[in-house]
């Protein structure tokens, strides 16, 4: 049975034009299914939208090498071929904040999802949400 590496990936979203401060990075899950040459293809699970209108669309195909402002790629676990759909089943049930004035974002969703994936053995036991936040923080 083939195993695929599970990553947390961040994207740089630039800076706020009014303050010059770095915007929070966009975080997502990436399951690498084909790597070699110029390809880094896989399945993405990410939160989309804006505060008050966030949604999870489900698995999306993506080649990370062609995906824009990639910042970091942190290996967090493995997924067997036969369990790829279980990742979606877990992530579709992760709570999404609907309060428009909240500071909650894709990073919160990803960390909540990480804990659920870890509980089912997809993510490495030694990783913690605090360590991930530190490694993937803005402004490094």
What does each model-found stretch correspond to?
Residues 1-48:
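N-terminal accessory segments that precede or flank the first globular/catalytic domain
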Residues 2, 6, 22, 50-51, ...:
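Alpha-helical structural elements
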Residues 5, 9, 53-54, 120:
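Intrinsically disordered, low-complexity segments enriched in small/polar residues
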Residues 11, 15, 59-60, 110, ...:
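Generic alpha-helical secondary structure signal
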Residues 21-23, 56-61, 88-91:
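Surface-exposed beta-strand edges and their flanking turn/coil or helix-capping segments
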Residues 29-30, 35, 54, 114, ...:
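Phenylalanine-focused residue identity feature
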Residues 33-78:
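Cysteine protease-like catalytic core of ubiquitin/ubiquitin-like
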Residues 64-140:
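Active-site nucleophile-His-acid catalytic modules used for acyl/amide transfer and hydrolysis
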């Amino acid at each position: 049975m083939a195993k695929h590496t599970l990553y947390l990936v961040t994207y740089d979203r630039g800076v706020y034009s009014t303050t010059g401060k770095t915007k929070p990075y966009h975080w997502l899950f990436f399951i690498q299914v084909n790597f070699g040459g110029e390809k880094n293809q896989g399945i993405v699970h990410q939160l989309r939208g804006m505060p008050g209108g966030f949604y999870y669309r489900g698995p999306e195909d993506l080649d990370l090498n062609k995906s824009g402002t990639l910042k970091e790629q942190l290996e967090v676990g493995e997924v067997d071929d036969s369990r790829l759909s279980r990742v979606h089943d877990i992530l579709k049930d992760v709570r999404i904040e609907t309060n428009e004035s909240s500071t909650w974002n894709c990073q919160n969703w990803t960390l909540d999802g990480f804990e659920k994936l870890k509980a089912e053995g997809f993510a490495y036991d030694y990783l913690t949400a605090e360590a991930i936040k530190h490694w993937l923080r803005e402004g490094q």
